[in-house]
C-alpha cells in the first residue's frame, strides 16, 4: 500500500508553491500562556506545530483548544512516543537521523506508528537533523545528537539527499530551541539543492531579517518558538519578512 499525500501536506505544498515559503509557529503545550500565544499567531502563521514536554494539562486538551482558537492546521512534533493525540490534524513522522542512539533513529517512530494509524493521523515523513549548536540545547542533550558542524554544510546536504532517497518529503534543519545562532545559509542552500524536497529551518531565528535570509537561501518553511513565547507580537513582522522573501525567491527562480 502506497501512502498518499494527505490534505494537510497538500495545503502546505500549495502555500509553498504560491507564496515561496510558509511560516510555522511552535507552541510548547507546557507553556502556561499557550492560549495567549495561539490568539496572537492565528492571523499570521500558516500552521501550528505542537511539541515539548507535557505537564499537568493533557495533550488532547491543549491540542483541541489550539485548533479551536486558531482554525489552522495543527501538526504534532512529538518529543517521544507519548506525544501523539487524535485531536491533531497531522504528525511530523520523523527520524532523528544523526542521533547516536538508535532509539531516536528508528525505535521511537516504530513504537508510535500503530498509535498514529489507530488515530488516523496524516503523516508528514521527515528527516530531523541536529545542527550546531544543538548540543547545547535540551533536544540535543535528550536526543544524544551527533551535531553537524556549521562549517561542514555538505554533511547536512548529503543527509538531506539520503532522506529524499528514503522517500521522505521533508527535512528539518534544527539548531535547537533558543539556539545562540541559526543554521547558516550555505547549509540550507546545499540541502535544498541536493535533496529537492521541502526544507524546514528552525532554532535561533530571532529577527525578520534573518528569516528573510534563510528563505532566500532555500528554506521552504521557517519555524519560530522561543521568540513567539517571549514576544507574540513579533510574529506579524516575521510573517511579512518570510512572505516577502518567498515572493522574491520565486521571482529570482523564474528568471533562471
From Swiss-Prot:
GO molecular function, one term: phosphoglycerol geranylgeranyltransferase activity
UniProt cross-references to InterPro entries, sorted A to Z: GGGP/HepGP_synthase_sf, GGGP_HepGP_synthase, GGGP_synth, IGPS_HisA/HisF
Cofactor(s) required for function per UniProt: Mg(2+)
Presence of the UniProt keyword Cytoplasm in the record: yes
Function per UniProt: Prenyltransferase that catalyzes the transfer of the geranylgeranyl moiety of geranylgeranyl diphosphate (GGPP) to the C3 hydroxyl of sn-glycerol-1-phosphate (G1P). This reaction is the first ether-bond-formation step in the biosynthesis of archaeal membrane lipids.
Lineage: Archaea, Methanobacteriati, Methanobacteriota, Methanomada group, Methanococci
Enzyme class: transferase
Biological process according to GO: glycerophospholipid biosynthetic process
Family: Belongs to the GGGP/HepGP synthase family. Group II subfamily.
Binding annotation for sn-glycerol 1-phosphate: 172-178, 203-204, 225-226
This protein's name: Geranylgeranylglyceryl phosphate synthase
UniProtKB keywords: Cytoplasm, Lipid biosynthesis, Lipid metabolism, Magnesium, Metal-binding, Phospholipid biosynthesis, Phospholipid metabolism, Transferase
Catalytic activity: sn-glycerol 1-phosphate + (2E,6E,10E)-geranylgeranyl diphosphate = sn-3-O-(geranylgeranyl)glycerol 1-phosphate + diphosphate
Main location: cytoplasm
EC number: 2.5.1.41
Amino acid at each position: 500500500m502506497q501512502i498518499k499525500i494527505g490534505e494537510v501536506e497538500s495545503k502546505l505544498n500549495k502555500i509553498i508553491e504560491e507564496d515561496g515559503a510558509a511560516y510555522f509557529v511552535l507552541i510548547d503545550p507546557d507553556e502556561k500562556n499557550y492560549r495567549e500565544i495561539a490568539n496572537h499567531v492565528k492571523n499570521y502563521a500558516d500552521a501550528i506545530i505542537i511539541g515539548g514536554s507535557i505537564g499537568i494539562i493533557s495533550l488532547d486538551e491543549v491540542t483541541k483548544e489550539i485548533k479551536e482558537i486558531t482554525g489552522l492546521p495543527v501538526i504534532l512534533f512529538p518529543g517521544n512516543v507519548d506525544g501523539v493525540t487524535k485531536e491533531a490534524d497531522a504528525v511530523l513522522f520523523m527520524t532523528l537521523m544523526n542521533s547516536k542512539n538508535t532509539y531516536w533513529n528508528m525505535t521511537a517512530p516504530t513504537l508510535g506508528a500503530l498509535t498514529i494509524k489507530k488515530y488516523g493521523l496524516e503523516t508528514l515523513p521527515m528527516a530531523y537533523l541536529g545542527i550546531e549548536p544543538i548540543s547545547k540545547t535540551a533536544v540535543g542533550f535528550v536526543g544524544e545528537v551527533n551535531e553537524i558542524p556549521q562549517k561542514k554544510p555538505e554533511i547536512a546536504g548529503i543527509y538531506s539527499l539520503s532522506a529524499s532517497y528514503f522517500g521522505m518529503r521533508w527535512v528539518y534543519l534544527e539548531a535547537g530551541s533558543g539556539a545562540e545562532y541559526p543554521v547558516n545559509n550555505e547549509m540550507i542552500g546545499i540541502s535544498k539543492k541536493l535533496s529537492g524536497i521541502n526544507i524546514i529551518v528552525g532554532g535561533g531565528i530571532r529577527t525578520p531579517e534573518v528569516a528573510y535570509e534563510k528563505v532566500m537561501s532555500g528554506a521552504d518553511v521557517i519555524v519560530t518558538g522561543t521568540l513567539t513565547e517571549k514576544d507574540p507580537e513579533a510574529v506579524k513582522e516575521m510573517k511579512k519578512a518570510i512572505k516577502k522573501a518567498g515572493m522574491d525567491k520565486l521571482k529570482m527562480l523564474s528568471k533562471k
